[in-house]
Amino acid sequence: GKEYEQDLSLGDVKYHLGYESEVETDHGKKVRLSLMPNPSHLETVGALVQGMVRSRIDSQYNGDYNRVAPIVIHGDAAIAAQGIVYEVIQMSQLAGYKTGGTIHLVINNQVGFTTNYLDARSSTYSTDVAKVTRSPVFHVNGDDVEAIIFTVKLAMEFRQKFHADVFIDILCYRKYGHNEGDEPRFTQPLLYKAIEKHPNPRDIYADKLAAQGTLTKAETTNLNHEFDLFLEGKYKESEKIDKVKVRRFLKGEYLDYKNPSKIDLIQPVKTGVKKVELLRIAERINTLPADKKFFKKIDRIVEDRRMMILDNRMDWAMAELLAYGTLLEEGFQVRLSGQDTERGTFAHRHASFVVEDTDEKYFPLKNISETQGQFHVFNSHLSEYGVLGFEYGYSLTNPRSLTIWEAQFGDFFNVAQVIFDQYISSAYEKWGMMNSLVLYLPHGYEGQGPEHSSARIERFLNLTADNNMQVVVPTTPANMFHLVRRQLHWNVRIPLIIFTPKSLLRHPMVTSSVDELSNGHFQEIIEDVVSKPEKIRKLVFTYGKLYYDLHKRQAEEGIQDVTIVRVEQLFPLPIDQIKSIIAKYQHVEKIIWAQDEPSNMGAWQHVQRFLPTVPFELISRPASASPAGGLMYQHNLRLKMILDSVFEEKVLA
């Protein structure tokens, strides 16, 4: 293939590139058509299409489902076998995800690469998944051109009237192999003998038109010849092109944003909010309507939050809610979804309150002011793959929206691994497609076992390159506040992966003052205050919850010759800041990298990659195939060994 005209690092094969255009209908109306870029991981793009459409419905069309429609083209083998199809179809009537119905076009060529359809599904039809939502299915002969056109029009009318999914099963065949180099006669010799003898749909339709007296054979032959000449002319033109120009998908939406350099991602961004404004918004979201009755514990939660403001000691949830509230007041849109997200897995957020003895919900963040931006929060169905794909698509179309997907526990992110690998980490490098999706992945070693401890930080760090995303482990409410606000207040749009806390949500040390939210910005590094740097003999770098365990041991034992540095941003790693801190401590005997995770996990190998000359000594749990142990006493023993190794001259076994 030819080189790209733009500075895309790698690009992609032509089959995967997206496209946009505006066409004029026979009635003179202009319609915008968008073809999503998509990988060879079949059916993944369907979730993104749903998210894109819902985003436009929310932000551009004021909830009108008739202004935009999703169309998803499937293969018969894929729609019958890929689990994400079921996840996405289950969304179709859910309040947080419905798009007014999808047109599903199934190109049923009765073979999946080399697999016969009898080996590809147990159901009679490839479209039997439509029974889940009782959607109509039209089975159409692929040789009957007019029947296909009629069915597509009928399906669209049905969709517009009933706002439900419609399936069109086009029974047809694949004339050649799976790709240019494939020989189908190896595996389907009988089928391809039949296909060889079968007239193509164009000739069948030409014969029909001739029989009707609509067009003569000579006229259709002439039309075919004219079209062949047109194609040949375009081919000749393409030969003169030296470099391919990849038309950037959604270019218009991202004109104000740039592909970031490393400098862009470590420059301070002003994210503070005036104190009076913070207090006003806090008052609004901590006030329940007097005409509604709430569960007593809800009243207590709200009262506790009011006291936080008065005591000037805000916890994680309060800072998080204020981040959303301030963005909403600035006119941005905020959308947050995931399993149990309204309340929060750990009952910390309470973004909605249920009115007692009813199903009515009250959303404080929807009631800040009449001029605020839209706030959406939804509990998703029990899906990671489909929902993450949806939220990625949602965030694509509106760079002024803070779109967040939260995992119930960070451990479950890998159910959606395809979305991370094929889209979140690589879409810009392949397709020039920007995105600012935020992910909340609860992470922390607290003795809850291998399924509820690790969001596998190492996996995300392994995907980092070319400033493609941010990987962050904030440890203070203020830093979380500034981090969330930064995502919309700088002129770049890249994904943000946040490893959020669990036990720290209510930790007495994990609080921030109103001034810390009002002033300052996100801190990539947080240093402990040291009055006499010359006395320090151990310099400990760490991140996440382990900092508070280290701090507690240090305070209990009155240790003065050790200082602890929190690395809040793991990518882009603040290399210059780390080196500058090391240079300050002239008498240090040991530079330690301490982490809760096993040595083959966490950030250790990532740090070695970017700081190979720094003589770090690793203190962590031993290398392990499983991310965490399942016994509390074992967990506590390992933690004690880490702390002992940091503060005493002991070797971690």
Model regions: which residues?
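Conserved internal helical-beta-strand scaffold that buttresses enzyme catalytic cores
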Residues: 1-71, 77-84, 89-102, 108-118, ...
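Thiamine diphosphate
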Residues: 99-217, 221-225, 433-434, 445-456, ...
